[in-house]
Amino acid sequence: MGKIIGIDLGTTNSCVAVLDGDKPRVIENAEGERTTASVVAYTDGETLVGQPAKRQAVTNPTNTLFAIKRLIGRRFEDEEVQRDIEIMPYKIVKADNGDAWVEAQGQKMAAPQVSAEILKKMKKTAEDFLGEEVTGAVITVPAYFNDAQRQATKDAGRIAGLEVKRIINEPTAAALAYGLDKSGGDRTIAVYDLGGGTFDISIIEIDEVEGEKTFEVLATNGDTHLGGEDFDTRLINYLVDEFNKEQGINLKNDPLAMQRVKEAAEKAKIELSSTSQTDVNLPYVTADATGPKHMNVKVTRAKLESLVEDLVQRSLEPLKVALADADLSVNDITDVILVGGQTRMPMVQAKVAEFFGKEARRDVNPDEAVAMGAAVQGGVLAGDVKDVLLLDVTPLSLGIETMGGVMTKLVEKNTTIPTKANQVFSTAEDNQSAVTIHVLQGERKQASFNKSLGQFNLEGIQAAPRGMPQIEVTFDLDADGILHVSAKDKQTGKEQKITIQASGGLSDEDIEKMVQEAEANKEADKKFEELAAARNQADQMIHGTRKQVEEAGEALPAEEKEKIEAAISELETARKGDDKEAIDAKVQALMTAAQKLMEIAQQQAQAQQAQGADADAQQSKEDDVVDAEFEEVKDDKK
């Protein structure tokens, strides 16, 4: 079996790791970075991912897609999506199935399709390091992701050409990375994971028995729409408001200016983790009739903290719920681990330390721990790691809608997965021939307040008074946290099964089409690379030939020189086009035309070599004379 890589598909940054021996190792990307910006940009004929995409965002804001993870598995009408529409420079549109999609270069795309571009970059990074093709991956998701979001993440993996061996929760992965090489008995850890777009808290127990470690998640909670991007937005709004007060210009209507402000806000936020004050200077941020305008705003750490205090406070509520669900108090927590880039903010660290009554561990890299844990799980699945057992949980309760619009739970939240549960239901009316099974996820009693995961019908029920037929509903929750549901009429034996796919989501046909598009793009990318290489070769050939013509001087006959110049001119014309074969042919033609020039260059080189040899011989003679004189002087002295 080939290597199974671990991928942390993050909102702001992504990271890939692999098990190297018995230790997880983070792999650097082509730019030499250990993390890759989760940014995808679409330009004319090219798709950029990571830093190259981020660099051109200011000049291409509407086609540069970031924080796509906030949209994955979401419906267009979701409150969180509607909030994002207000602040994102790119277009968020409604798909035919009601999902939140994006639009770039006039093309509508599903969130998993865009995320697949980031996963492809991670896959290529691992393949370059390992020197072999990679097909298997463990991908992490926020613990509080629902079924639709998990399914959409798996879809992204498929579109990227990966077989997703397991979906695991980010805090659990971080605990794996942290606890793998720790000894010293049992411990209960709290993983506080505040990333770019999501927040999770997991309480995890690590037991060690005869060298085998069991990582058991006791409880998990969180907020899938709280993260560093929200902190950035608060600072962006403050900077824009200050500029408006000073200049009377609202930058929110200018996408280019807003992209510059976004980058400056992100930079200022990071700087304020290590300094108490910073300046945001953006010369020529915009202009009006009176001339260019510059932004110059001083931001103190205290100001930033006042802007985001309620967001940090919002992250503390799930901590209380998770502890209560695990039936523990803060005193039972052995270690606190911080994961996610936003946990570098001193205020976050202070509030978490205050809540738990202890400082968080400093020996965990918040940007890399999740990918490393995913690589460990990859090693477990590949059979390379034998002494680790991971027991994860489902973050939300699962059930069906029953009479009166009530949600009846079959699987309670924080149940260890995989798990199976069944319950017998009956009909609500006399002679009812079909029932609709409406599957829900959430904690509210009223069905309409929970997340609808999908519905299906069981038909052909024999006519009988209400309450008589026995319909057995079975929930089968797999290790990825994805639900399979079946309903069976116990009298007739008729059964209906589905893998839950929300009324939205991508169908197998959609995914297959996107896989084919990705393959076609792969072919297009390959052609683009080959064309770029041909153009580079043409440039080198033109430059090298012109240099040799100059060096040959009068030794090159005039008619030969004309032939070469004509061939160079034809190659320059071909180089401007998109036909690789034409460029290759003209390179060949120039090589043929420059044959005489090559001969002259060779003769000149040989002549220089001969001159060099003569000079060496002459030098050698002189050296001999000096030695001889030296010898004679010694003889005289005798």
Curated annotation (Swiss-Prot):
Phosphothreonine: modified positions: 198
**Induction statement:** By stress conditions e.g. heat shock.
What ranges does the record list as Acidic residues composition bias? 624-638
Q: Which InterPro entries match?
A: ATPase_NBD (IPR043129), Chaperone_DnaK (IPR012725), Heat_shock_70_CS (IPR018181), HSP70_C_sf (IPR029048), HSP70_peptide-bd_sf (IPR029047), Hsp_70_fam (IPR013126)
What name has this protein been given in UniProt? Chaperone protein DnaK
**Family (UniProt):** Belongs to the heat shock protein 70 family.
Recorded GO molecular functions are:
ATP binding; ATP-dependent protein folding chaperone; unfolded protein binding
Summarizing the function annotation, the protein's role is: Acts as a chaperone.
Q: Where is the signal peptide?
A: none
Stretches with biased composition (Low complexity): 603-618
The ranges of region (Disordered) come to 603-638
- Any idea which UniProt keywords this protein has? ATP-binding, Chaperone, Nucleotide-binding, Phosphoprotein, Stress response
The lineage's top-level taxon is Bacteria
* Pfam families in UniProt: HSP70
